[in-house]
Amino acid sequence: MFDILMYLFENFIHSETEIRVDQDELTEELVRAGFHHDEIYKALAWLEKLAALQETDIKPYFCKGISTSLSRIYTHEEQMRLDVECRGFLMFLEQVNVLDASTREMVIDRVMEIDSSEFCLEDLKWVVLMVLFNVPGKEKAYAQMEDLLFEEPDGILH
């Protein structure tokens, strides 16, 4: 499923190519690209839920009035999916104002819905980018995240 999300994001959304509204046409194109129907439907449902998150003011996605000094306590299931490196990266993104409490919760929600036994920091970065792309008013945060995703480290790290 994550491969399909990446394919869609890279080929349609991120490249600013007009995405087809017709789900059947899009499904057929994905089948021609080698993806299976079950995984395609899961990926499209994942994207629909992502779009729905920004259209609701139901908590926890919009955490208005929450102090930024509070730490997020992760459930056992979230800890199993998001390792220490991923959780640390989410905290870093909040500290540099790429994410706020509501977008962080959107990211966690979308991560938990990914049907994959393995999830790594690179996958998390793409989910963050997809979430920020879909939230109006987060263009600056999206650009910052894009820089973080595509920047190459300079020199050797010690």
From Swiss-Prot:
Pfam families (UniProt xref): DUF494
InterPro entries reported for this sequence: Smg
HAMAP family in UniProt: Smg
Family under the similarity heading: Belongs to the Smg family.
PANTHER family found in the cross-reference section: PROTEIN SMG
Name of the protein in question: Protein Smg homolog
Organism: Alteromonas mediterranea (strain DSM 17117 / CIP 110805 / LMG 28347 / Deep ecotype)
Chain's gene name: smg
